[in-house]
Amino acid sequence: GLVGSEMCIRDRLMDPATGNVTAKGLCERIGLDGRLTHKVPATGKKVEKDIPMPTHKEAIEAVMAILVDPADGVIKSVDEIDAVGHRVLHGGDKFVESCIIDEACKQAIRDCIPLGPLHNPANLMGIEACEKAMPGKPQVAVFDTAFHMTMPPKAYRYAIPTKYYTEDHLRRYGFHGTSHRFVSKRCIELMGGVENAHRVIVCHLGNGSSLSAVKDGKCQDTSMG
């Protein structure tokens, strides 16, 4: 799985059968001097390297190289990777769930660049670099905004002239959706209930923070714009 932003990429290699993380890493300072950190949880091994990364393309290439490195890698070939998941910041109101990446999906991500100018271009570069490195492998886009697309108009519309919504797509979209989805479902599981019989307030606390109100497993409101 890949999580990309303007100057960094986080990666996880997972065993789909167990959910265990086989390797994880971070490429940072993309566009500057570049630095790669690679960790193998099973052994505690940690590798840090300074690697030129002019763009996200070179960062993806560095990730692939360390994964198959004879000394530091955990797989023999990228052919062992079954699929790639990408966390994509902004899906606008086009996506209500994750989707298999095809040309239409990539164009929709491009169309949302005005809404996510720092992250969406980086997400696209990561997707296209993976397509080149692993042609034919399925790739999935997981949108940060998708979980919040169940909000009613009274929650996502602002008290501003309608033209700003219809022409400029100015509305509440919400973020941290993957976190809010997971936490709300896990909360209901721990309470021993069923998804359609609970109201939950979810707090995402990290480098950015947000709250969401979830009813019957669907987002009703969120604090981010």
Predicted regions and their residues:
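General beta-strand structural signal in soluble alpha/beta enzymes
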Residues: H86, P117-N120, P138-F143, I201-C203, ...
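Short glycine-rich, Thr/Ser-proximal phosphate-binding strand/loop in the N-terminal lobe
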Residues: I9-M53
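Flexible, glycine/proline-enriched loop segments at strand-loop-helix junctions
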Residues: I109-N120, K137, T166-G177
